[in-house]
Amino acid sequence: MRAERWSQTVRQIRSPRALRVIPLTALMLISGCGEKEQVSSATPPPDVGVYTVRAQALTLTTDLPGRTSAFRVAEVRPQVSGILQKRSFVEGAEVKLGQQLYQIDPRTYEAQLRRAEANRTSAQNLARRYETLLKTKAVSKQQYDDALAAWKQAEADYQVARIDVQYTRVLSPISGRIGRSTVTEGALVTNGQAQSLATVTQLDPIYVDVTQPITKLLGLQKALESGRLQKTGENQAEVSLTLDDGSAYPLPGTLKFSEVSVDPTTGSVTLRAEFPNPNRKLLPGMFVHALLKEGVQNAAILVPQQAISRDTRGVPSVWVVKADNTVESREIQTLRTVGNAWLISNGVTEGERIITEGVQRVRSGIAVNAVEAKNVNLVDGFAATTEASAN
């Protein structure tokens, strides 16, 4: 039975009708594959947004934390002893150089001054009389010299007594803002006491002390020496200030000096800037951020942050659209962030196009349809003063 069925099947396959159907089916399959290949080859290149790289002069700055310190600080102390009779200032007010702050009881010192004045007059008269007698040799030269020395000593005692009387009027040693008084009327104060009577602080101008890692300072010096950076000017470096609440201080300052030694515990060097402070907005001890101009890079290239990707090793790269509209991945070397972009040292050149939109749709070697990117807005990219924070 099985042998008969098999023979019947073979006869059907070998029949002319079956032989005509098989080539037709194969032809339809081949035709279908060709249509799929034509559809695939007709797929348009993906759209990508590109940013055209440009080079331009860029002023580089560095943001350093710091604290304000007073331009001058003077502790008011008594130079004579006595009972404090009067306080002549309002706590927290502005005082001038030489303005009277306190009055110490002067009566004892005025009496000593009168006694010193009498002794001076007596010594002066004796010396002049001996001078006359010396001409007639009524007194010896030694007696005259002793009288003359006594006169000079009496004169010195008089001057000391006069100064002590002046010291009973305690004056402000500098101009500035005076703090609270640590003593009241009726208190006994002494010359050389440890506690000051008050403190006067000069707030205009005011210092800002910032610290910079020595490695960054050395790198800046090398960049200036090599010519990669140009000095911003021949005068003192300009510094701008940001307060702790994020607001900008309106008046610029100047960098005065850097410390001559490095802190061995932190590896940092202290820089001091001076700021005008006419409205007394800055007070000693405030935490601030100082923005220091480092120099000008004449052919700086900025790359938007969204154009940069990193591999598993952390190496940054960008997708570059070549002249034939094909793309390639290219490694770059980043230096620092500038606003919302990266300053790079190599990898791409001016005029090249890098992809910032549609990165996920590209692979190396494919053709793309490059249009101007809409997601690029380099904040403060090439402004005259660019806020750059060192890595």
Curated annotation (Swiss-Prot):
This is Toluene efflux pump periplasmic linker protein TtgG. It comes from Pseudomonas putida (strain DOT-T1E). PANTHER family: ACRA/E-RELATED COMPONENT OF DRUG EFFLUX TRANSPORTER, MULTIDRUG EFFLUX PUMP SUBUNIT ACRA-RELATED. Residues 1-32 form the signal peptide. A lipid is attached at C33 (S-diacylglycerol cysteine). One of its GO terms (molecular function) is transmembrane transporter activity. The lineage of its organism: Bacteria, Pseudomonadati, Pseudomonadota, Gammaproteobacteria, Pseudomonadales. Its main location: membrane. It is found in: Cell inner membrane. Belongs to the membrane fusion protein (MFP) (TC 8.A.1) family. The gene is ttgG. The periplasmic linker component of an organic solvent efflux pump. Involved in export of a number of organic solvents, including toluene and styrene. This is the most important solvent efflux pump in this strain, although it can export AMP and some antibiotics. It is a lipid-anchor. It holds the Pfam family HlyD_D23.
